[in-house]
Design a protein with these regions (language model features):
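Cation-handling catalytic/transport regions enriched in His/Asp/Glu
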Residues: 1-218
Length: 218
């Protein structure tokens, strides 16, 4: 059995953030540099900002905002948004992209530990942010994608969480600094495919219903 509390001890939000930046560097050649506090306007003191640049040329890609904590008046869930999309129509405008979560803010000096599911969602939403940061279009309205592509980049990023590269370099115990045990990693990967037959049936049922609705005689 997989003990979610045991897994949590190796999932620190700061380390996961570093892992996402590492993945973005490997995939897209992006470099994330923390922006000094107070140098960029933010809507809440909890929001952190990174400058995103090309690792080779130093070209500014944009800014990435992270608003990780729950607070009164903030909508629930996790999501990505863009405050400004890329465009060259009226000069080259860089991207202002953001990820938002609702984690409970830890006590000062304490790490924020998250579940495997929440870590997966964290990576998922970062995939949407990378989509925005990767855009290179003349008209800002063209920054999106076709409907069937909407969740592709986010679901693809999820898979990087369970890669050996990320696990071996960023999943360490929050108190001892020891790497996550191989036995626990095996349990996590096995759990990922548990009850997969039911999930597949759900997907097939949705597809069948979609076909029936569209083939019905109006």
């Amino acid at each position: 059995n997989l003990d979610s509390d045991e897994v949590k001890q190796y999932l620190q939000l700061d380390k996961l953030t570093d892992a996402m930046h590492y993945v973005a560097g490997r995939l897209l050649n992006f470099k994330f540099t923390p922006v000094p506090e107070g140098s960029v306007p933010v809507f809440h003191e909890d929001v952190k900002v990174w400058e995103v640049t090309d690792k080779d040329t130093g070209e500014n890609i944009g800014l990435w905002y992270l608003d990780p904590y729950a607070r009164e008046g903030k909508r629930s869930g996790a999501w990505a948004t863009s405050y400004r999309s890329h465009t060259t129509f009226d000069g080259n405008k860089n991207v202002l992209s953001a990820n938002n979560s609702n984690f409970i803010k830890p006590a000062p000096g304490e790490p924020l530990l998250v579940s495997w599911d929440d870590a997966t969602t964290f990576f998922h939403e970062f995939g949407h942010a990378l989509h925005s940061l990767s855009s290179n279009v003349k008209y800002p309205t063209l920054n999106g994608g076709v409907r069937d592509y909407t969740e592709f980049q986010s679901q693809l990023l999820e898979r990087w969480l369970s890669t050996d590269d990320v696990i071996n370099n960023f999943l360490v115990h929050n108190k001892t600094g020891e790497p996550i045990p191989a036995e626990l990693v095996a349990k996590i990967k096995n759990a990922a495919t548990f009850n997969q037959g039911f999930s597949t049936t759900e997907y097939l049922a949705s597809a069948i219903m979609d076909m029936k609705f569209h083939m019905a005689d109006p």
